[in-house]
C-alpha cells in the first residue's frame, strides 16, 4: 500500500504526539490484543501476560521502537524492517493475521490516548501505515 504525501505527514505528526509514551502505548496495545484475541497468547508461552507485566512492557517497547524506526523511514519500509521480517517469518513463525490484530489494537490505543488528534484522516493514514508495516513483515513468508 502506497502512502501519499498527506499520509506520511499525518503519520509523522501523530507519532510525534505519541512521543515518550510509545513504549507504554505499545504495551497497552499488546495487552488489548491478548485480551481481545486470546489465541495470540500462544506466541508468548514464556511471558507473564498479566496486566503491567515487565515482559509485556518490554515487548511493547520493542514494538514501539520498530514503529518509530519505520516512521523515520517511510520511503524504505522494506529495507528498514527486513531483519524483523526475517525474524517473524523464519524464526518465530508468527501467523500473519496477528499483525492485523496488533495493528487494530494499536489504533484503538492511540484513539483512546489522542482523541483530539485522531481525526478520520489521521486514522486512515495510520491504518495504511500499519497495513504497510504488516505487508513488509509478512513479505518473507513466501
Swiss-Prot record:
InterPro entries: Globin (IPR000971), Globin-like_sf (IPR009050), Globin/Proto (IPR012292), Hemoglobin_a-typ (IPR002338), Hemoglobin_oxygen_transport (IPR050056), Hemoglobin_pi (IPR002339). Heme b binds at residue 88. GO terms for cellular component: blood microparticle; haptoglobin-hemoglobin complex; hemoglobin complex. The modification Phosphotyrosine is found at residue 25. Red blood cells. The modification Phosphoserine is found at residues 4, 36, 50, 103, 125, 132, 139. The modification N6-succinyllysine is found at residues 8, 12, 17, 41. GO terms for molecular function: haptoglobin binding; heme binding; iron ion binding; organic acid binding; oxygen binding; oxygen carrier activity; peroxidase activity. GO terms for biological process: hydrogen peroxide catabolic process. The modification N6-acetyllysine is found at residue 17. It comes from the Eukaryota. The keyword Heme applies. The modification Phosphothreonine is found at residues 109, 135, 138. Keywords: Acetylation, Heme, Iron, Metal-binding, Oxygen transport, Phosphoprotein, Transport. Heterotetramer of two alpha chains and two beta chains. Belongs to the globin family. Involved in oxygen transport from the lung to the various peripheral tissues. This is Hemoglobin subunit alpha. It comes from Pantholops hodgsonii (Chiru). The lineage of its organism: Eukaryota, Metazoa, Chordata, Craniata, Vertebrata. The gene is HBA.
Amino acid at each position: 500500500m502506497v502512502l501519499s504525501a498527506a499520509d506520511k505527514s499525518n503519520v509523522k505528526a501523530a507519532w510525534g504526539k505519541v512521543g515518550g509514551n510509545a513504549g507504554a502505548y505499545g504495551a497497552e496495545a499488546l495487552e488489548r490484543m491478548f485480551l481481545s484475541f486470546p489465541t495470540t497468547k500462544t506466541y508468548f508461552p514464556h511471558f507473564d501476560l498479566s496486566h503491567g507485566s515487565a515482559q509485556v512492557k518490554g515487548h511493547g517497547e520493542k514494538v514501539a521502537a520498530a514503529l518509530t524506526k519505520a516512521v523515520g523511514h517511510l520511503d524504505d519500509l522494506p529495507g528498514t524492517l527486513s531483519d524483523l521480517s526475517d525474524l517473524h517469518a523464519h524464526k518465530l513463525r508468527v501467523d500473519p493475521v496477528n499483525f492485523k490484530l496488533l495493528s487494530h489494537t494499536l489504533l484503538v490505543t492511540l484513539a483512546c490516548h489522542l482523541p483530539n488528534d485522531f481525526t478520520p484522516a489521521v486514522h486512515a493514514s495510520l491504518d495504511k501505515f500499519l497495513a504497510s508495516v504488516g505487508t513488509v513483515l509478512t513479505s518473507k513468508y513466501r
